[in-house]
Amino acid sequence: LKPRSSRKYMVIQAGVSLFFVITSLFSAAHLVVSSWLVIGCFVIGYLVARHVFTAYEEDDPTFLSIVWGFLIAELGWASYHWVMAYDITPTLLLPMVSIIAALFGFVGVRFFDAKFHDEPLRKRLQAPVLFTIAVLAVLLIRELSVLFNYTS
């Protein structure tokens, strides 16, 4: 991924970075207080957004990057108090917040790309939003079924 410099690959780099850094950040979340985790989420959100907006040659990427950083920080703060993770291996857990951040990033990039190319939002956002809702519904149903012991 890294040697590539086209817009598509820069956006993929940002998405992969967001996913893996949030995963590693939440893997060590129990060692720090929530304020440090929120600051870390803000920094990664800001840097990832800055990377994407640089790929689109946005005139003023700072404000939009700060907004995205705050959204990721808010997601991190809420997730810190309600951490859920999936067992990948006995020693490796995948935090749900990583999946949610990646999905929100996917929808956000599609939104910005549609605005950048002056395309209709409904056409460009329908599939990503439905995919995000479907994945979030599956995750929520799974967590609720585990919580209420409906499945084994």
What function would you assign to each model-found segment?
Residues 1-33:
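Membrane-interface helix-loop-helix junctions at boundaries between adjacent transmembrane segments
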Residues 69-76, 95-111:
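Hydrophobic alpha-helical membrane segments
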Residues 139-152:
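Juxtamembrane boundary at the C-terminal end of a transmembrane helix
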